[in-house]
């Protein structure tokens, strides 16, 4: 399985998203991997652009899967929720339910969607999953939660 082409994914996402290809070193394996960097049209609470990445990776069974990953926003926020008050716990339950119903995984500090080889071949399906993850990021990072005192 291969990553969708930049042009095909750009067409499937629409002109408000920006797709570019870059190479980076995987921190775990040390290998250089190709990553599609997707800049969304949305801003986080600090007015920084929200982005997600799309990369190939082999799972423990030896299957190559596509991973759509939020490497910063919702992951950081979700892992800090237990330090918040009661409304934070309610928000976490709501977000976990949302994640379950959108084929999304929260694991080891990352929020991501795994796509099987047959799903990864359809650029429209991939684009819809990117949009689903973006929606979750927007919902999670805009939750009005006040921090408790330590």
Language model features with spans:
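Nuclease-adjacent, charged terminal/linker segments that flank catalytic cores
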Residues: 1-135
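Hydrophobic, aromatic-enriched interface-forming segments
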Residues: 132-150
């Amino acid at each position: 399985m291969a990553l969708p082409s930049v042009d095909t994914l750009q067409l499937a996402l629409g002109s408000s998203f920006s797709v570019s290809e870059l190479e980076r070193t995987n921190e775990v394996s040390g290998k250089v991997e190709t990553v599609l960097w997707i800049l969304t049209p949305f801003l986080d609470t600090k007015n920084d652009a929200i982005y997600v990445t799309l990369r190939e990776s082999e799972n423990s069974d030896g299957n190559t899967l596509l991973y759509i990953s939020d490497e910063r926003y919702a992951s950081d926020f979700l892992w800090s929720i237990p330090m918040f008050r009661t409304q934070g716990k309610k928000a976490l339950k709501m977000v976990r339910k949302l994640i379950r119903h959108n084929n999304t995984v929260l694991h080891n500090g990352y929020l991501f969607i795994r796509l099987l080889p047959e799903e990864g071949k359809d650029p429209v399906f991939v684009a819809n999953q990117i949009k689903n993850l973006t929606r979750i990021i927007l919902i999670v990072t805009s939750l009005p939660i006040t921090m408790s005192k330590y």
